[in-house]
Amino acid sequence: MKVLVINPIMYTSETKNIKRAASIKDTMMYDFCLAFHEMGHSVTLVGGEPFKPTKSEIYPFEVLWWKCKCQKVCMPHCLPFMPETYRYVKQHRAEYDLIITSEVFSLNSLMAYRAAPDKTIIWHELAKHNAIMKKIPSKIWYGVIARLFMRNARVVARSVEARNFVKKYCMNTDVNVIDHGVNLDKFKASAEKDNSFVVCSQLIERKKIDGILEKFAKYLDQYNSTCQLFIIGEGELKEKLQRMAQTLGIAPNVIFTGKMTHDELLPILSKSKALLVNTVKDNNMISIVEAIAVGTPIVTTDVPLNSTYIKDYQLGIAKKHWDESDLNDVVSNSEMYIENCMKYRYKLSTKQRVEQFLEIERERLDDGKK
């Protein structure tokens, strides 16, 4: 099967000033396309040119970088506009068996669907209206554009919450949910854990890392004074958080590693007793998926959409407000949580995700023969 994957935003940028990464090989969408390739399919990945890596890379499949236009209005980090989408899909639609785009609220998804309606699947993540400009553009898009011009588009949501939201506007939303996947050949699991927790996050306001430091300080005081906390990531609040660790008297126990590649962070992530998340605004978090894939339980707020299956399968603790007692709980019951993660990790495989998409496409073809 020949597959086209259109994903302009290759990684998250909190501001319009996109900091180009050295490589895209640590991104979720790269691993997704790699799974197609390894399963014997021909795949082409399209990204927005502002996300093109700084160093030259060789890929086992075709990767195209398309220019983003009208950047003052259609900012590439949140609403990229690639005019090449419509021209390319219209011209090459006969060559592809399946076209996968990201998000219903997307000019590129609209163009791909209008150019090849029978071959396009929109992989949708948002479970509520986009907050840009007080939600007005989002409400107009879903209420008018999606209902009029994407009403019959095939949509596959990445969570139950996203499915329940988008099906109000796109009637052909699939009942099946396909979450982010992980390359299990890269993410090796470990049941052996060190005396440490880990945070994998941008160091920005909405991630509320300061709250994690406060809870960790109480955990050290009440339960385990020798435990360590690895904070992996960069961001505007790094120096403030380092000063806070000093003020709380926990600086010797907190290690700020900076941003790390997958190869660098995996030994830490796989050996930690839990991944800690304190976000107040997120959708599906790929760091949660990656932690479960290496057998590391989660302690998180109930904000990430992943929290639903964390609760359902007891992959850790997900609640509105967690505290130091929950850290003690995940450590005291680590054997159970780790075992559950070990069982669940196979559901997260990128190859499993590919098979789910192929099954949806097979069902469409079978329905067409009836």
Predicted regions and their residues:
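Aromatic "clamp/platform" in nucleotide-sugar-dependent glycosyltransferases that forms part
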Residues: 280-281
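Carbohydrate-associated surface elements
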Residues: 161, 181
